[in-house]
């Protein structure tokens, strides 16, 4: 293990000189192999093509290589109309674990635009005032027929929406870097875009030096890995829980409140300090030392400690249960915790039982310029009805997670690359031979334990852990304001009984600014049933389903109507998705084809 942990600034990359296309297909049913036709658009020239076979589409892209081809959900669907399983497996990739960012084949770089726009294409179109319309029913139901010009226009509209999105996000990124999109390449993900903009606008002067040989500035900062590792232990993530809702029981007259951009809010709040990785120290683990740091406006701390909540004291600290899930209802906490929650716990009446380790750091405000600058731009765009407001919002919300990336060993799948690795002297100690299809020992790949995928050059858990801790404190205060009327919470929202409305709004700031709360349900939810985390159903006065939240299962049919069993965990649920590449390799399936899985809730399922 390295004795130094580094964080390095990322700048703008050189412009890509090849052509850039967007691609979309229509199929007979949810099956990339049942190709009806496809369309493409050159995002720079606007030239559009229609392909009546996947072979024609592939030939077009390879004849124009080197080029980049974007499709929305490319690695779950569209790509596998062009590449077969063997080709996709052997192709060189940019990936982190099973997350694929780019597949390279015959000098064509295939990319998935969902990494830039983590939303449905219809939502992207709506933001541009370019509604994509409804998918023709014959494609949904696999009723094969002649392709019409109306069909083609529908598919081309998808390409135009995606091309518009890529141009706009590239323009936004480049201008934020003080460049034009013709002078710099577009990063692979919205998180990478956010990090590069932050580096350009907010990198600290003391985080770097002038190289004596080149005379160029090197933007980098270092710390003892111990501090990064202990902050990783304090990185608990978001809070989702049933509070006073009884699982599976009806509750009447419910309201939902959401915090406006909670994570950007806590990042930019002037009272919130974050640890400077270049100024960290271990401190004698005593209660007095902890309290002194908490009361010092120049420093922040995090501690490995044990705390407990006496009877009647609010419980809100994250505890990892035996099932591997976070539990916020426990009266005892043991582990690493960041200062914001230690401070709130002491305020609410928690008692420190023992402190095992205590670390402190100089406190800094690294996000104020980044968030405040983007927020000002977002408000300008919003007042002008400019669709780029959505892009700015994504950039504001995508930064903090970049600091908490956990890189994984690089996978090597290309046969030539595997052969090269096997000839290296350090092969036995460096590489691990694995198989996607372990039963038949097929589709081998190597894990390179000396080289990681994903950027650990941006990893500083001090930022990601403290952002989440501050956010959980904001959420905890809202839940406490709801009192026994608080039913459910999910990261930045609270559901309460209507009778708790007056008290909640007295104690919590409401409005449209960063961090203020807003009533998302001006029409009261007449009836709700909360089953478990990420699973609840709302009903209107006529007992019709108003909203169904059920992570991992299908709740609507192809017409957008709720399924009969949607939102009823006592009944059989189904997930409907497409086969991804690595699943296809493991299970002997065809990527890009429909996959339906039956799911029965382990607690509530009663049979059909």
Residue ranges and their predicted role:
Residues 15-22, 31-35, 41-608:
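Conserved acidic
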Residues 1-21:
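N-terminal accessory regions of nucleic-acid-interacting proteins
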